[in-house]
Amino acid sequence: MSITIFLLLCVFGLNQAATLKIMNGTECQRNSQPWQVGLFEGNNLRCGGVLIDRRWVLTAAHCSGSRYWVRLGEHSLSQLDWTEQIRRSGFSVTYPSYQGSLKSHEHDLRLLRLGLPVRLTRGVQTLPLPSTCVTAGTECHISGWGTTNHPWNPYPDRLQCLDLPIVSDDTCHAVYPGRITENMVCAGGIAGQDACQGDSGGPLVCGGVLQGLVSWGSVGPCGQNGIPGVYTKVCKYTDWIRMVIRNN
């Protein structure tokens, strides 16, 4: 099957019940998040991800599918944007200390190598890794396809963005006692505004730099007041990420 035909099938055959994601976001400006990745199994959107190299995508370790169709340069999921690129994921590397989400959410990151490098265009770009860790109070943003955790709300067709502040470690520890480690960063806690299931692995972007990956949050409904989302703290893993890319 040609890539063009497959792309058409993906665009018009998306299963809209696949996932639930950004709550109360607004439509992103087209091509403003060119590093945003959608990880699909067939027509089902499973997770988000972020392009950090022409051949490498970073996502959450609990996005554990063996192979994905990796869609880049997307804005609308039902119409051709003419910026789309599709790759097949192959080789993947999960952080060695990750124990699985049933035991611990720590070290929740995974690298996917694409079968072919992407072409860098206005709609497909890499996002830089951080050189320092983000501080509390910094305004950041997340992105993804979806609205709320209520199934009667319409599944958004276009990429959604949401601004969220970084929450202090003390505040996050108070909300999740005994569960937050130095390898996690919290953001949000504003009523009705959050990432949610299916956004996993998507980017938390602060000042044009990747600072987090959507990882976990409240057990109950997403977007509860005073309960921030928890993200993998990417600044703690940059040496490992670069080593994997360099050696593979």
Label the predicted regions:
Residues 1-248:
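Extracellular "complement/coagulation-type" protease architecture
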